[in-house]
Curated annotation (Swiss-Prot):
Coiled coil: none annotated. The keyword Acyltransferase does not apply. Its cofactor is Zn(2+). One of its GO terms (biological process) is tRNA wobble guanine modification. InterPro entries: ArchSynthase1/Queuine_TRR (IPR050076), TGT (IPR004803), TGT-like_sf (IPR036511), tRNA_ribo_trans-like (IPR002616). The keyword Cell division does not apply. The active site is at 92 (proton acceptor), 267 (nucleophile). It is an enzyme of class 2 (transferase). This is Queuine tRNA-ribosyltransferase. The gene is tgt. Catalyzes the base-exchange of a guanine (G) residue with the queuine precursor 7-aminomethyl-7-deazaguanine (PreQ1) at position 34 (anticodon wobble position) in tRNAs with GU(N) anticodons (tRNA-Asp, -Asn, -His and -Tyr). Catalysis occurs through a double-displacement mechanism. The nucleophile active site attacks the C1' of nucleotide 34 to detach the guanine base from the RNA, forming a covalent enzyme-RNA intermediate. The proton acceptor active site deprotonates the incoming PreQ1, allowing a nucleophilic attack on the C1' of the ribose to form the product. It catalyses: 7-aminomethyl-7-carbaguanine + guanosine(34) in tRNA = 7-aminomethyl-7-carbaguanosine(34) in tRNA + guanine. Gene3D superfamilies: Queuine tRNA-ribosyltransferase-like.
Amino acid sequence: MSRLQFQLQTRDGRARRGRLTFPRGTVETPAFMPVGTYGSVKGILPDDVRALGAEIILGNTFHLYLRPGLDIIADHGGLHGFCRWDGPILTDSGGFQVFSLAHRRKITEQGVTFASPTDGARVFLGPEESMKIQKVLDSDVVMIFDECTPYPATEDVARRSMELSLRWAQRSRNAHDELGNDAALFGIVQGGVHTDLRSRSAEALQAIGFDGYAVGGLAVGEPEHERNAMLDHLDPELPSDRPRYLMGVGRPEDLVEGVARGVDMFDCVMPTRNARNGHYFTSFGTVRIRNSQYARDMDPIEPGCGCVACTGGYTRSYLRHLDRCNEMLAPMLGTLHNLFYYEKLMADIRAAIEAGTFLAFRESFYAARGAVAPPL
């Protein structure tokens, strides 16, 4: 029996307002999950992550398995004790990271053999191995092991990939149950940009039975309109009483469009990675702090923002100086700002759904950027 309870509280159009309840805490949805690839959200403390409004974070099974290894994490009682985060954690299965090693991997029915990016050693990962690793990590949400369908892919390639992922999904389900793991287990819908394959994947996953359903294989190069079309197609085909997770999709616009199409959960490295590259998100667009126009700019990143970078009086001029000097404080302040922006965006979205004003919120979101909302 899964430790996860999901309550769908209200809707506004297709946008959903809900709550995930775990023994380690509750998560208000729609939710954005900061990514802690190696067991930390880069550059900031777990208490900072919590203070920014995050209630759940993501850990990376693939990288944690390779380094530091399961024995060391087990010494700490699992990933929560290792990284000092006491709230819920979702761990991915490693499938996407294996996908990214395109020239150093071999896929068979059993799983994937690849050269470790850390030391070149031969490593095998399959559904059973992924479930065992995630059991040791003791995450609150476990993802099945799947193959991320590349883009572009012919329908035949996408079909064979999707069918392999379905067989791995059943093996993941079996292994998860045999391990006696009471963490939530999420299935992952694949099928590329082919609606019939997405439908087959969603139907087959529901026949197996999972605690939540993720949409994978997007944000891999496809145009935005194709991604939105897949979400439009899947919205009525996924069970309404289970959480829905759009994997790895993370521009602010993508979050708004995902929510508009029934998505409950998101993750992406974008707010943290972009902060390290001097790109700061605001309600009016992106501040690229390395541009010369900010050399003597006395404003904070976003006037009126409640993050510590903006309320602390740090000017764009100062942040540009820190960035140009490669000072550690620049990405730290940028990360604090970007994650604050993302978590506040999600809080504002939740409030708009509760008030029945999400569509108006969506229009104003784009208007502030000088843009027009894409069609729904």
